[in-house]
Amino acid sequence: MAIAASCGSLNALTLGLPTRAAVPDAKGALPKQMFIGRGAVSAKTKQRFATDIESIGMLAILRPATTGLAESRRFPEILVLGLHVPSGAAVPVEVIDHIAAQRQGGIVFVCVRDGGPLPDAETGEPIASDAEQCAFAVRRNVPVKPGHTPITKVHAGAWRPAAGSRLTVYGTTMEELWDSLCAQTIADDIDGTDIDARIAARERATFLESEYAKAKAAHARARTTEQRNAAYGKM
């Protein structure tokens, strides 16, 4: 078999994806101009491509024929796209949003960087690391009521050492696979059941934690009993 296209040290095979889904190295590299050369693109988006992205590559194409899963009208195929970003850079959310908006099927983004802060295994606090790192990201539709304007959102997982980063083909249909890949990215869980409800619950919890932290800080800054009581009421 031809050498598989890679992003840093990661390719379809090291990620654990089917060999048949791997894109050959000769066909993997994608020029940035491919994504910003058509239609109206803001100067800010062009700048993001220039500064936030070092290279783009197609790592794998997941289809019924390459996964053994049943077809799905919504997801005839799912692309696995590698984005190499500068050392220490964040997941390029704006670039991901722009690329994913150009097609209807799902895309899993494999973001790779050569070093940056990683959470300490014991304390969870960020510590500097020069190891190659990976973070997965997806752009997913947010459930809305019928007739309402569609909403999408980019979700990214945490940075982790690239060695050992895996994506698992799971489910019986391509749509179930997409839900599973989203769950693997967002919840670090292979089971994509009720993933939208789980995303909503997680975001609600994050919001409440943020509001509690703000109220706690306001309570600490309060100089009068009235101010402290007002802040306490929000906690």
Residue ranges, per PLM feature:
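Short, hydrophobic/aromatic alpha-helical segments in well-folded domains
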Residues: 95, 215-218, 234
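Intrinsic-disorder/low-complexity, polar/charged segments
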Residues: 42, 169-173, 194, 224
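Extended assembly-interface/linker segments at domain junctions
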Residues: 93-190
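N-terminal, leucine/charged-rich tether regions that mediate assembly and partner docking
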Residues: 1-122
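Non-transmembrane amphipathic alpha-helical segments
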Residues: 201, 205-222
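Short, charge/polar-rich alpha-helical segments
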Residues: 188-203
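Short, charged, amphipathic alpha-helical segments
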Residues: 225-235
